[in-house]
């Protein structure tokens, strides 16, 4: 299923211009609070800049960034229904929106916005947890979400500086500090986050 005028499929990529971006922004904005939308625009600004610096596809960076939190404000019962209905690992039910809005949210983006580009969808899936294997676009969205201009927390300035010179080091920095925060707050840690840590922090030494 797709929403009438969003059944554009791959033209999001092949014909992505200012008009297409505006249409996509409108669809995204309708799904979230103004505060969340400002964050999304900050992630897009950062992702496109990183894509330009590291030689990634800037259109894909824009689309992935604009849609990465598309499902963030959906109710938990909608996620639970999709997890049960669509064959996701039921262990996901032990977690919450912080995990679901990426891993499950990518399927919502695909269904409702007719975005079928697997590279974009994968970047949405792993933008919170990371992964042991990450494409250039995966890393860009993962880091951009962490360092966008609206973020304000101890260490974000250093993270931004690292991202300008070494994207892999920025992935490692983010992963390490996110894991430390989760441990300090005694939050449940999703296994893929540990896989990300082992690959990008431990194995990069």
Predicted region positions:
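Short, small-residue-biased leader/transition segments that mark boundaries at the very start
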Residues: 1-3
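Generic N-terminal amphipathic, Lys/Arg-enriched alpha-helix
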Residues: 10-12, 16-32
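Divalent metal-dependent catalytic cores for phosphoryl transfer on phosphate-bearing substrates
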Residues: 26-30, 48, 53-175
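Generic secondary-structure signature for well-ordered alpha-helical cores
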Residues: 33, 52, 129, 180-187
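A short, charge-rich alpha-helical start-of-domain segment used by transcription regulators
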Residues: 34-38
């Amino acid at each position: 299923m797709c929403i009438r005028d969003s059944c554009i499929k791959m033209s999001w990529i092949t014909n992505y211009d200012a008009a297409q971006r505006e249409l996509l922004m409108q669809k995204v904005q309708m799904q979230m609070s103004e505060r969340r939308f400002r964050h999304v625009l900050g992630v897009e600004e950062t992702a496109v800049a990183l894509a330009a610096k590291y030689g990634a596809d800037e259109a894909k960076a824009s689309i992935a960034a604009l849609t990465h939190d598309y499902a963030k404000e959906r109710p938990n019962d909608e996620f639970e229904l999709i997890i049960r209905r669509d064959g996701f690992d039921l262990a996901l039910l032990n977690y919450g929106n912080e995990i679901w809005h990426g891993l499950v949210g990518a399927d919502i983006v695909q269904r409702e916005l007719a975005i079928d580009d697997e590279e974009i969808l994968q970047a949405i899936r792993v933008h919170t947890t990371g992964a042991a294997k990450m494409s250039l676009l995966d890393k860009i969205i993962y880091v951009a979400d962490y360092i966008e201009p609206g973020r304000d927390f101890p260490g974000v300035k250093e993270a931004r500086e690292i991202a300008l010179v070494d994207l892999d080091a920025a992935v490692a920095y983010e992963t390490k500090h996110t894991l430390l925060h989760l441990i300090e707050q005694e939050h449940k840690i999703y296994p893929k986050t540990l896989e990300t840590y082992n690959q990008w922090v431990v194995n990069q030494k």
